[in-house]
Amino acid sequence: MKYLVLIGDGMSDLPLKELKGKTPLEAAKTPNMDYLAQNGVCGWVNNVPQSLPPGSDVASMSIFGYDPAKYYTGRGPLEAASLGVKLAKDDVAFRCNLVTVKGGIMKDFTAGHIKTSEARKVMQELDKRLGRKGIKFYPGLSYRHLLVVSSAVVSGAVKTVPPHDITGKKIHKYLPKSDILLELMNESEVILHEMKTKATMIWPWGQGKLPSMPSFKKKYGLTGAVITAVDLLKGMGKTLGLEVINVPGATGYLDTNYIGKAKYALKALKKHDIVFVHVEAPDEAGHEGSIPKKIRAIEDFDKLVVGTVVRGLGSLGARILVLPDHPTPIKYMTHTREAVPFVAWQANDKCQITNVKCWSYNEKELKKSKVRIKHGHELMKKFIGGKI
């Protein structure tokens, strides 16, 4: 048996008055996910333990089948793995955003979705002028970068806040309680002002040390691959011993190469037992608070990823799991910890046993289902074991 996991990041949402009480997922045209819902098993899964924040790092770890309460150490070390940065035992890795702050307010946690080519020059200049023993900057993709600091310089216990959680808010309440980090942030403002870039400062967050996790092959007996534009998921894949496949034109935004991701996934499925395909666009639209963009991202995910995969499977008896990692409601413009809707479907299996018939894939319709997975990391075992 082959397995595909299709992740629409932040896809689920709340009813909106602008959509006459519908969610973006409900308002979007999603014939392919609807087909899976009609012929598969629908349910709800909670990917975020109560003890942890509702980040993509925590929720994605659950989707991969690992208990975040046991293995999660922070986002930074996973992104370090993606960039090929080897952490020493005492290193603390921070995700380092390039952000736009004006008048003391977090205007844009993406710095206008700064181009990677421009961002690379910015990060190289920051490392040249601010980097020193125990402090190193690494360029990533667009606004997403890495800062590695020795624990002798900054404690991993320092409290930080994701910049996407404070869009439109004054930043002074959310600054890290660390003299070194504040110094780096303040000095970055001077450098970025000189460079005349959309980014006005750096924002370090999501810190942690290297996690110790068994490989996916060891835990589940399957070989696998990950397809994503996001360093976090690439790092997760590398940490778990999965092949990370880079797709040309994958941007982590609405202009990503959806079809390319689907086609590369089908090709990878010939080599591996399981392939994870992650699409960031719905989450980005949620953070922007844009209803039209979120609907467009969901429809593109359905048509170009889900549809391409389902049509391309042919006679291959693969199982498909479709789900978000967490909600990113338009109303809040950030992640929340509520359960998310999922559908599991098997190719060439006309009608699977389920407790209730769902006619479409959205939050309202799936409320009919009594299938509930309380601990998200348990879903993977049920999925590959044919228990759902």
Go through each PLM region and give its residues:
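Feature captures the catalytic ectodomains and active-site-proximal regions of enzymes
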Residues: 1-388
